[in-house]
Amino acid sequence: KHFAHFPVVYISGLEVYEYLKAKRTKVKIKHLPLSISDRYMSLFEEQITKDIDIINVGRKNKVMDEYIQQFLLKYPNTNYVHREMENGENIYYSSVHGRLGTLTAREDLLKILSRSKIAIVTSPGLDGGEQRTGGFNPVTPRVFEAAIGKCYMIGKYEKNSEYYSFGLDKLVEMPNSYIEFETIVQDELITPFNRTDDYAAFLKANL
């Protein structure tokens, strides 16, 4: 009812859009998928030294975080960068170098992703996030940012229509156990990035 007087409402999440269409909402809605600006493609073309092993720049998925903590116990020299909330600010830490500080702009976020070999990407409505999202699991901007940074992607997504529409089944490794996670991480940490063509096609299709 809050949007009834709007001429059109754009919905970025395909899952939500399909849900509202099925409910025959009286509001005129259109699907406008997530994308990323082409102004960041210059960063994609750069060759940047990757000195970070694993990065999680956003919220943490409970299961993936448990896998990471297990991995760090076994391989303590792994350089893992992650975000913590402190006094309302996003503060980034490295498991090797300690407190890194804040990232104040999206460009800073993309640059640190470009230094990372593996990025963790997940749906927000899984493993305890269901109440926050109402059970919906949209694809997040992180996959576009990780693609710009040429990071291998490991994560956890609901295999819904949006997941397949973006082709994440071909881009994101989704381990079902810690052993699978460890195997994937070990392989990707020693394998120079080799998915430039796949990522370029993904980004071009979604600019």
Please tell me what each predicted stretch does.
Residues 2-168:
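Nucleotide-sugar donor-binding catalytic core of glycosyltransferases
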Residues 119, 139, 147-148, 152-207:
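Pol beta-like nucleotidyltransferase catalytic core
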